[in-house]
């Protein structure tokens, strides 16, 4: 007689697009995000962080003006910690409350006291204008949002030193690291 086995497929773990892994060196929580690694902006973010660290910097501020669920920003902050930054601040903004909720939930799983995050529901212009008084080291955005919108371009110039966007043919602008 054959045994019949049933499985509740709804109880199976679902793979997350971005998840927090185990505790890494120095007590940090390792963020692994295949979404972030495949983002066309990741190599520019990685290079900017490396250049800032190589220049002797120990603190870094990163702003993602259209962060979605926050995977790229959170991955950048984790990478900054792995590079040896000791004070890391990330600010993400997006117009979708649902995506900001996901970003906040992911950020809450990172328990490293050297990494501070803030996510808010805001449009790109509002988020960038909030950075004018204390410009970020790196601002991440989608160039398509700024195309043909001079107010976005001006806000980007004032919001950060290094601008990272997804237009491969366009050079990042702002002051060099």
Q: Over which residues does each language-model region extend?
A:
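A general structural motif
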Residues: 57-59, 85-88, 135-136, 158-160
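Conserved class I S-adenosyl-L-methionine
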Residues: 58-68
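Class I SAM-dependent methyltransferase SAM/SAH-binding core
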Residues: 77-124
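Short conserved loop adjoining the S-adenosyl-L-methionine
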Residues: 126-133
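Glycine-rich SAM-binding Motif I of class I
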Residues: 70-74
């Amino acid at each position: 007689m054959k045994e019949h086995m049933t499985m509740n497929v709804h109880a199976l773990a679902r793979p997350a697009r971005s998840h927090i892994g185990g505790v890494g060196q120095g007590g940090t929580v390792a963020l692994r995000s295949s979404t972030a690694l495949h983002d066309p902006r990741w190599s520019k973010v990685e290079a900017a962080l490396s250049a800032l660290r190589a220049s002797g910097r120990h603190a870094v501020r990163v702003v993602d003006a259209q962060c979605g669920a926050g995977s790229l920003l959170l991955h950048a902050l984790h990478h900054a910690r792995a590079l040896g930054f000791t004070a890391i601040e990330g600010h993400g903004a997006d117009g979708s409350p649902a995506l900001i909720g996901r970003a906040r939930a992911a950020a809450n799983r990172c328990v490293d006291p050297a990494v501070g995050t803030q996510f808010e529901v805001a449009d790109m212009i509002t988020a960038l204008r909030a950075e004018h008084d204390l410009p970020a080291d790196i601002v991440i955005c989608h160039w398509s949002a700024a195309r043909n919108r001079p107010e976005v371009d001006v806000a980007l110039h004032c919001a950060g030193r290094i601008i990272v966007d997804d237009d491969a043919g366009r050079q990042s602008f702002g002051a060099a690291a």
